[in-house]
Each structure stands twice: as structure tokens, then as C-alpha cells.
């Protein structure tokens, strides 16, 4: 409420002492008044303190072993990938702390962004999310297939940065230390090495556009999203300290690796190694293979850390269902416990759920939908059946051959 401009009473700001005639606006509270100038000053102070808190947080980044322990609580398997990510993330934030305090003649540490290669449902997105959460930094996810280079219909690359700014509650300083995960990066690969001379709206052009923000630039972002327009107000964000993690399935890249290794074996004749499965080939990927798949050399050069994830097997999926702190089985047990009902999944049921996920080629991503299909009728009926004290999910229930077993008090 604005101050009363009576001829008899002149209101003054309780903080700076200026009268209502000396400022644009005075806001009244319970026997307290504050002017617009003091409000603006308060905002600046809060902004500076938040920025200092961000910098302070960076000095307390968990060591690689500590990061690995955090990942192990939530992510099953993928040991090599978790180690690579733990080291890369630690070095990234250590680099930021070093840069903030460095002298001009100190070594210039370059940013090491990350490329994750692995099949659908192997945990790429979840790994990135877990890292960001453990570090308490803003996190944003983007889909590379929705992006186009400037001037074409689609989503501008800069809109990725807007998502990060929004995740940081529009605190730009905090966003500038965040993590961005770009999924489906393999879908914007050039189709073959002999690229058409026609305009490539969603392939190489997007790689070039992403390259600019990944390597570090001051980008102008429309605060409301959408396309840029002349005279539009922009938010400036420096991307040099944003960690970019890009991921994709890269279906077929193992064939490129096989071909390269096969040529070397023929060429040298000796010391040949037999690699028996595609998972082993994935661990042999080098920049040359990724370039042959269709990513441009400049883009690959900005992604020096490559983490290959393996296809999850039945045992991995069962462990994912039961072991992590936020395991799906634990979540559904908690849901039914609120109704006073115990929930048990038999071993055969867990194997059947994992088997279905493998059949559908959805990996860990498809586990929840399979449980939802199995549990739908139970979650609908049981809350109204006060006599039910326990529900047992069997293999037959998962396969749709029978209903779950109910135990009555």
C-alpha cells in the first residue's frame, strides 16, 4: 500500500529517512515504511550474497571417491562410467574454484565436458540428475532432436540456457555454475561421411550452434523463451563454467569400432585381441569412431571425457528394482504401507518384470510402467478393503496369468 500523501503527515522511509517527496514510492507495513530505493538496494545485497554462497559451495565439492559413493546409493552397475563421471565432475568444479583465485600467469585450465554413450534405459539421464542433485547445482535437460539452428522453425539452442536459468530461480550467477544434459545427441549426427551440400537444419547446423555455448560464450537469452526479436530484453549468461553432459544411444557405433579394430588386426597380424560382445566394443570407442558416426570434429573436441554405459542385464534390473535408496519396490511398498498393507514381490515376479523390460528394450526406464500395469487393480481396490493386510506379487501376476495374492486379517 502506498504511503498517505496528506498535507499534515509526511511519511519517511524507516531505513534511509527520505520523505515521500524525495522518492518515487513508499510502501507501508506494520508501523514500518520502505522506499523503492531501499527495496532496490536490498535486492542487490541479496543477489551479491547468493553469488558468494555459490562460490563458497564450490570450495566444498565432494572428492571423486565421495561422488562415487553417492552415485552407488542410487545407480546400479555402470562402474566405469560412474568413475569417469566422478573424476570429470570433480575436476570441473575444482577448475572453477582455481580460476576464481588464479593469477594471470597461472596455467589456464580448460573445461572438460562429457559425452555419455549407452543404450536406452542404461541410466544416462539419471546419472546426470544424481550428480547435479548431490552437488546442489541447477540442472536442466534438453532433447537435441527438438533443436534447430537460428532462423529455422524449432527450438533455439539458447533456450537450453533458459531452462537452466529457470532451474536456478532466475539467479544467473547460480545458473552459470549449473549442469546441462543434452539427450539424443546421436540423432543430430551427419548421415554418413559424404554429407549433402543442402542445408542441414537439425544435424551439423545444430552441432555448430551447440558448439558455441559448450565451449564458452556470453549468450543472450530471451527471458520468456521463444525466438529472439529486435529490441527485446535479454538475459546475459556466461557459459564458460557450465558443465555440459551430452548423451545418446549411438546405435551401430560398435560396428564402426569392430571395423577399425579389425583393420588394425589385419595390418599388424600379431597381438590381436578378441572382443566377444558389443559391450566390450563400447569400451573401445575413440574420437575417430564418433566422428565416423557423424559428429563433427570440433564438437567432439569439446567433449574430451567419454563414458560408455553398458546394456543392463536381468540381474542389474532386479538390483535396480530393490537396492537403491529410491528403489521402485521400496516406493510401492511405502505407498501401500500408508493404507496399512504390506507389499511383497516374489523373486519370480522381479525376474518377470526385468525380463519384460529387456524384451521391450526399454531398460531401467521401462520398469515403472511394468509395475504400474501389474499394480493398477491392487492400488484401486485395496485402499477400500480394510481386511487386506498383505499383497503378494507373483510371476504369474506380472505376466497377466493371475491376480496378485491377497492376505486377509
Swiss-Prot record:
Entry keyword annotation includes Metal-binding: yes
Name assigned to this protein: ATP-dependent Clp protease ATP-binding subunit ClpX
GO molecular function, one term: protein dimerization activity
Domain spans labelled ClpX-type ZB: 1-54
InterPro entries for this protein: AAA+_ATPase, ATP-dep_Clp_protease_ClpX, ATPase_AAA_core, Clp_ATPase_C, Clp_protease_ATP-bd_su_ClpX, ClpX_bact, P-loop_NTPase, Znf_CppX_C4
Pfam family, one: AAA_2
Residues annotated for ATP binding in this entry: 119-126
Family designation: Belongs to the ClpX chaperone family.
Task performed by this protein: ATP-dependent specificity component of the Clp protease. It directs the protease to specific substrates. Can perform chaperone functions in the absence of ClpP.
Taxonomy, superkingdom: Bacteria
Keywords: ATP-binding, Chaperone, Metal-binding, Nucleotide-binding, Zinc
PANTHER family according to UniProt: ATP-DEPENDENT CLP PROTEASE ATP-BINDING SUBUNIT CLPX-LIKE, MITOCHONDRIAL, ATP-DEPENDENT CLP PROTEASE ATP-BINDING SUBUNIT CLPX-LIKE, MITOCHONDRIAL-RELATED
Gene Ontology BP term (one): proteolysis involved in protein catabolic process
GO CC entries: HslUV protease complex
Amino acid at each position: 500500500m502506498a504511503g498517505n500523501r496528506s498535507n499534515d503527515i509526511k511519511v519517511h522511509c524507516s531505513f534511509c529517512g527520505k520523505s515521500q517527496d524525495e522518492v518515487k514510492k513508499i510502501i507501508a507495513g506494520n508501523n514500518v515504511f520502505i522506499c523503492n530505493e531501499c527495496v532496490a538496494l536490498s535486492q542487490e545485497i541479496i543477489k551479491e550474497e547468493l553469488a558468494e554462497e555459490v562460490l563458497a559451495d564450490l570450495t566444498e565439492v565432494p572428492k571423486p571417491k565421495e561422488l562415487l559413493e553417492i552415485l552407488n546409493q542410487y545407480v546400479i552397475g555402470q562402474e566405469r562410467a560412474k568413475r569417469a563421471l566422478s573424476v570429470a565432475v570433480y575436476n570441473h568444479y575444482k577448475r572453477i574454484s582455481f580460476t576464481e583465485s588464479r593469477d594471470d600467469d597461472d596455467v589456464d585450465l580448460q573445461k572438460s565436458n562429457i559425452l555419455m554413450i549407452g543404450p536406452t534405459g542404461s541410466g544416462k539421464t539419471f546419472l546426470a540428475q544424481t550428480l547435479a542433485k548431490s552437488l546442489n547445482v541447477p540442472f536442466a535437460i534438453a532433447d537435441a532432436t527438438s533443436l534447430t539452428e537460428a532462423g529455422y522453425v524449432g527450438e533455439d539452442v539458447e533456450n537450453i540456457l533458459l531452462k537452466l536459468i529457470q532451474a536456478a530461480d532466475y539467479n544467473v550467477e547460480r545458473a552459470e555454475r549449473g549442469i546441462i544434459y543434452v539427450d539424443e545427441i546421436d540423432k543430430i549426427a551427419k548421415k554418413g561421411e559424404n554429407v549433402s551440400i543442402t542445408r542441414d537444419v537439425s544435424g551439423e547446423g545444430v552441432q555448430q550452434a551447440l558448439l558455441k555455448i559448450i565451449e564458452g560464450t556470453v549468450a543472450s537469452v530471451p527471458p520468456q523463451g521463444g525466438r529472439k526479436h529486435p529490441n527485446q530484453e535479454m538475459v546475459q549468461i556466461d557459459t564458460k563454467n557450465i558443465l555440459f553432459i551430452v548423451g545418446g544411444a549411438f546405435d551401430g557405433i560398435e560396428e564402426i569400432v569392430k571395423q577399425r579394430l579389425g583393420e588394425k588386426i589385419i595390418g599388424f597380424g600379431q597381438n590381436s585381441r578378441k572382443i566377444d560382445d558389443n559391450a566390450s566394443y563400447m569400451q573401445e570407442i575413440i574420437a575417430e569412431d564418433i566422428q565416423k558416426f557423424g559428429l563433427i570434429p570440433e564438437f567432439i573436441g569439446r567433449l574430451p571425457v567419454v563414458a560408455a554405459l553398458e546394456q543392463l542385464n536381468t540381474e542389474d534390473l532386479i538390483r535396480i528394482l530393490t537396492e537403491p535408496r529410491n528403489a521402485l519396490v521400496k516406493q510401492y511398498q511405502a505407498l501401500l504401507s500408508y493404507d496399512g498393507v504390506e507389499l511383497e514381490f516374489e523373486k519370480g515376479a522381479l525376474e518377470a518384470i526385468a525380463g519384460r523390460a529387456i524384451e521391450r528394450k526399454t531398460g531401467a526406464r521401462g520398469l515403472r510402467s511394468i509395475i504400474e500395469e501389474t499394480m493398477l487393480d491392487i492400488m484401486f481396490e485395496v485402499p477400500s478393503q480394510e481386511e487386506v493386510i498383505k499383497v503378494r506379487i507373483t510371476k504369474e501376476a506380472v505376466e497377466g496369468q493371475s491376480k496378485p495374492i491377497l492376505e486377509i486379517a
